[in-house]
């Protein structure tokens, strides 16, 4: 579970101190997609960076399963999904997932990688190169990679922004099922409110505040 309590983040801009997040509090519940929506510049990306421990708030707390976020917690408990998937062109599909094991200092788990690829609809494609995959397939690789470390939280930064409507809904449906089945919390930044279902949670960000 992700809990952000009274989090404030500011940045220096010349002579001014700008407030990106203004004393925000919210939680992302396991088993649900929590959509984080708002206009450009509203603070969505800053919120996601704070949740991932990629920046330190000026004040407030960020907890994953009641533990303050630091580098160890980020490696052990958080899976990230990006807008462009951030895959390594020289590696095949399976090795994209195994990179996370190397980063975490554990023995590469090829069987787990293949199981996760099957789970996201890419069974038998472990030896394919990135250039042989469609945009939707690449995002499925990104989802499988995010699950390699058995996270309790997934943070997704506009993962459907480069996809058409049909592929976008497929990716969201896949994520929705995965977080329900595995009881994972998921913060999902998007500008596309048509992706949201009645079963999802919604956090609206405007001017650095949430509603």
Set out the residue ranges of the language-model regions.
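Catalytic Walker B motif of ABC-type/P-loop ATPase nucleotide-binding domains
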Residues: 154-157
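ABC-type ATPase nucleotide-binding domains, specifically the catalytic core motifs of the NBD
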Residues: 12-14, 98-111, 119
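Short coil-to-helix segment of the ABC ATPase nucleotide-binding domain corresponding to the Q-loop/switch region
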Residues: 91-98
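Helix-to-loop junction immediately C-terminal to a conserved catalytic motif
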Residues: 52
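Conserved signature/switch motifs of ABC ATPase nucleotide-binding domains
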Residues: 128, 149
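Conserved ABC ATPase signature
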Residues: 129-133, 137-139
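Conserved ABC transporter NBD signature motif
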Residues: 60-68
């Amino acid at each position: 579970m992700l809990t952000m309590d009274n989090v404030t983040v500011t940045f220096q801009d010349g002579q001014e101190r700008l407030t990106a997040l203004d004393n925000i509090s919210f939680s992302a519940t396991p088993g649900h997609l929590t959509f984080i929506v708002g206009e450009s510049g509203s603070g969505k990306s800053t919120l996601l960076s704070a949740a991932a421990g990629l920046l330190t708030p000026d004040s407030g707390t960020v907890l994953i399963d009641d533990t303050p976020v630091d580098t160890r917690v980020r490696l052990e408990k958080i899976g990230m999904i990006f807008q462009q998937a951030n895959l390594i062109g020289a590696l095949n599909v399976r090795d994209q997932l195994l990179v996370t094991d190397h980063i975490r200092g554990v023995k590469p788990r090829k069987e787990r990688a293949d199981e996760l690829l099957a789970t996201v609809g890419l069974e038998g494609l472990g030896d394919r190169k990135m250039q042989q995959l469609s945009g939707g397939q690449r995002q499925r690789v990104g989802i499988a990679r995010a699950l390699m470390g058995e996270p309790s939280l997934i943070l997704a930064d506009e993962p459907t922004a480069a996809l058409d409507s049909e592929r976008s809904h497929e990716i969201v449906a896949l994520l929705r099922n995965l977080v329900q089945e595995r009881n994972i919390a998921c913060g999902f930044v998007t500008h596309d409110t048509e992706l949201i279902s009645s079963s999802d949670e919604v956090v609206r960000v405007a001017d650095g505040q949430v509603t």
